[in-house]
């Protein structure tokens, strides 16, 4: 039902939080001081990353000029290139892949997962109506929604082409399965928007589908191309799963506590769009009157549907402030640490050395990153 008075931020008093509900902190295994330097962690695979970058930036000379420009801007905007880096590192765990004919297939895999990731971002921006990403205008800000979707489709096609270049049917099937999983996750997210009584399991299913599945494709696909034993292929799949789950959890934490300028969006952007993430679930679990929080949000959303978006924004702003002041963020970060400890454990059966150390260092980087 409609509410008669605007819902102000103070509707979420911090005194209602249970101050005793703080999790025990599980620290990651200490790493050398340089382990958090991503450039140092990528050093063993730098030549391979350059090859991936060259492949990503290749533009068909016959391509429609505006699409070619958009393609160059999307790929040229860079990013951490974590997905291809994980593929390259995983492929080298058994030693001696660089310089072999099979290494070109690993390069193609790395380009494939990165291009697939980029394509999903383009479509996400259309679905969310986002005009900015990391503070820069999205393709959606310049083109119509239809044109942007078509551009994303082109990227999907390019990713599929790269996958085919591996000439490995198991990897090609993995690419197809991953794409289907991503779409399933996107549909789940759309269905659960503004559903404030959904289960936390919905969140885990969603972030596996939209994020972790791509990391799984990178590490499992690389293990297949490296011809590792099935047990080790399974280990690297699990590594990708645990790494990817933690990566998205930290992303969702940063959405609440990160610097607006660095992230290029206001705090609580996911919640403002009706997407519930792990910090919110912990906030709700720790709140002594969770039902009142849900009632406030549901009423504010009704007001927004009736044209009064200010009520919704005020409600979310108040919740974000209260969430930051409590222990929900640390509880979510603890879950990320647990996933990353599992990821490190997944590497125990693989040869020790530079590549494994880089994978372990990336786990430490993920839990501490601020962007």
Residue ranges and their predicted role:
Residues 72, 160, 220, 281, ...:
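Amphipathic alpha-helical segments within well-ordered protein domains
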Residues 105-130, 180-181, 212-216, 220-223, ...:
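Active-site alpha-helical segments that house and flank conserved acidic catalytic motifs
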Residues 1-118, 122, 126-141, 177, ...:
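Conserved N-terminal diphosphate/IPP-binding helix and adjacent helical/loop segment
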Residues 93-102, 162-174, 189-206, 220-236, ...:
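Inter-helical turn/loop segments and adjacent helix faces that build the functional surface
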Residues 86, 159, 185, 280, ...:
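Residue-level signal for inorganic ion chemistry
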Residues 44-47, 51, 174, 206-213, ...:
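A non-catalytic, amphipathic alpha-helix used as a structural packing/dimerization or gating element
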Residues 133-155, 196-211, 234-238, 260-286, ...:
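Divalent-cation-assisted or electrostatically stabilized phosphate/pyrophosphate-binding catalytic cores
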